[in-house]
């Protein structure tokens, strides 16, 4: 009986590459010349620092663009609402969603059940296990999960026949 797991993970290596590319782009940008701005990655948190709030938001856009180039889904970003002002700099913290939260997992299971596909889905910790009689049904579930607007990117692993 075919089965698969739906998970939400961020590729650590690609994320680090995206941050490094963002730092490289920041150094070459004309609008940041002579300004105090930085992008740092530590403990799965990206810290964006700039001289004003507008520039912090520009840094978020730079990071988002570089993440999409490196095939890291920007939907996994969790950006602070307000920039923290300390001294003459503003800083934003960007966290990344790892694992599927229980509420999102319940919505995903309900979405799968409402689709009337002949599959069973169950929540297992921070992933959702889907089993069905045919591989085609699982592929339809994959398409359904990708199209869903649940605010989180999904990956599929442990696909077994």
From Swiss-Prot:
Q: Could you confirm whether the keyword Nucleus appears in this record?
A: no
Annotated Gene Ontology cellular component terms: cytosol
Q: Does the keyword Nucleotide-binding apply?
A: yes
* Keyword tags: Nucleotide-binding
What exactly does this protein do? Nucleotide-binding protein.
Q: Which family does it belong to?
A: Belongs to the YajQ family.
Supply the name of the protein: Nucleotide-binding protein Shal_3198
According to its UniProt entry, this protein's organism is: Shewanella halifaxensis (strain HAW-EB4)
């Amino acid at each position: 009986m075919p089965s698969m797991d739906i998970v939400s993970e961020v590729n650590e290596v690609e994320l680090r590459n995206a941050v490094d590319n963002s730092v490289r782009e920041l150094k070459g940008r004309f609008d940041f010349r002579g300004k105090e701005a930085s992008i740092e990655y530590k403990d799965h948190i990206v810290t964006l620092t700039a001289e004003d709030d507008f520039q912090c938001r520009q840094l978020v856009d730079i990071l988002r663009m570089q993440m999409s180039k490196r095939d890291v889904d920007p939907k996994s970003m969790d950006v602070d609402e307000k920039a923290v002002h300390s001294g003459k700099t503003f800083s934003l913290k960007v966290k990344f969603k790892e694992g599927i939260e229980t509420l999102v997992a319940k919505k995903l299971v309900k979405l799968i059940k409402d689709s009337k596909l002949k599959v069973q889905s169950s929540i297992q910790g921070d992933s959702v296990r889907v089993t069905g009689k045919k591989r085609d049904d699982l592929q339809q579930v994959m398409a359904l999960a990708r199209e869903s607007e649940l605010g989180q990117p999904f990956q599929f692993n442990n696909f077994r026949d």
